Amino acid sequence: MNYNKAVFEAAYGTSKQLPKDENIEFAFSGHSNVGKSSLMNAIFGRKALARVSSQPGKTVTVNFYDVEGVKFVDLPGYGYAKVSQSDKKRWSDLVEGYLMSDRDIRLVVQLVDSRHVPTKDDIQMINFMIDNEMPFVIALTKCDKLNKSERKKRENAFMEEIPCADQITMMWTSTETGEGISDLKEIFEDLACDEEEKA
């Protein structure tokens, strides 16, 4: 895949608007301001293709990006305290509507801030994917903010804090240093190649 060819395709505000699509999809999920858009921009090798929000929780849309026919999907961030109950319900309906629809979602990249204990919403999302047998990896973001000993401490803590941690692929990522970006691309390439071989 040539990630430099990534283009913004569309944004959808309700599950009914979501396109019926048979293309491979990779989705990105995480707390508001955990760095989803920044991570996607790093993968695409672009500075500002994925929209980085200065007002977390304001925009509740599922944003689709196309890379040579493969879809990269930015799910709206969750857990922002200042949104209304109606917006929270809209978020829930939209995200669940996307994840539970008949789509070819090959992988969900679940972002968790590497510096902190996973939030209640993070754990809820992880359990949702486990319960529904969805393929996912956890990207531990902003790892450049941790020194070696802090990283080891958080690594051990995550094994206790995250359900089924020993069965989940977790990777350190940083959009500042580029750590983990090539590893994620390799996973995407492998999953896309698997599909081409089946065809």
Positions of predicted regions on the chain:
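Amphipathic alpha-helical transducer elements in NTP-driven molecular machines
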Residues: 88-92, 102, 119, 123, ...
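Conserved G1/Walker A P-loop phosphate-binding module
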Residues: 1-82, 198
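Conserved C-terminal guanine-recognition region of P-loop GTPase G domains, centered on the G4
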Residues: 96-168
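Conserved amphipathic alpha-helical interaction elements at protein-protein interfaces in regulatory
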Residues: 45-49, 101, 131, 190, ...
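Short, glycine/charged-enriched secondary-structure capping and boundary segments
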Residues: 22-23, 41-43, 86-88, 123-127, ...
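Canonical P-loop GTPase G-domain recognition
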Residues: 3-15, 145-199
